[in-house]
């Protein structure tokens, strides 16, 4: 099989694992046995040509609430494990969908985007991102490789970003002080 076949099969497997993780972690709020079924179907755009200001965006995986879809973009600079093949990355993006469904009621353009004052800190988005990092890490605990607090490391070339997103960092934890 060629690279894209392996990548798509890996992405499919990782989305299945992420769905199972959320099905196990989040009980059905109505106790009707649905679990994470509310996030189905998982729509995925693979190797998508996404443009921002006319430039193609590469080296990323996203959940885009306004199209209710995951977008796996072509890689260019990231030459390690492709993002679709990294369970932590896929679980991280799935966590964004869960947050959109559970906290934002499936809003295509969540209210916090419209009311954001442009400052570099947005509490709700930061909470979404932090929870996504936690779930990206937690989903890796189900695999043979065990828990990977630096789940971005196999895929990401930027050591600074990997270190910043390392969920085992004590200095990044919020305290009561």
Walk through the language-model features, giving the residues of each.
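Zinc-dependent metallohydrolase catalytic domains
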Residues: 4, 8-91, 99-177
């Amino acid at each position: 099989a060629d690279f894209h076949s392996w990548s798509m099969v890996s992405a499919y497997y990782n989305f299945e694992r992420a769905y199972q993780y959320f099905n196990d972690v989040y009980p059905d709020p109505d106790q009707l046995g649905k679990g994470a079924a509310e996030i189905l179907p998982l729509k995925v755009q693979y190797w998508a040509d996404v443009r921002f200001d006319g430039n193609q965006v590469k080296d990323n995986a996203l959940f885009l609430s306004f199209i209710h879809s995951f977008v796996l973009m072509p890689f260019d600079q990231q030459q390690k494990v492709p993002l679709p093949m990294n369970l932590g990355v896929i679980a991280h993006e799935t966590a964004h969908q869960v947050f959109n469904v559970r906290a934002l009621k499936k809003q295509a353009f969540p209210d916090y985007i419209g009311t954001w004052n442009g400052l570099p800190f947005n509490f709700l988005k930061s909470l979404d991102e932090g929870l996504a990092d936690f779930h990206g890490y937690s989903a890796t605990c189900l695999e043979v490789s065990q828990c990977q607090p630096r789940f971005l490391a196999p895929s990401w070339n930027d050591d600074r970003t990997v270190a910043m997103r390392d969920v085992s960092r004590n200095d990044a934890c919020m305290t009561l002080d």
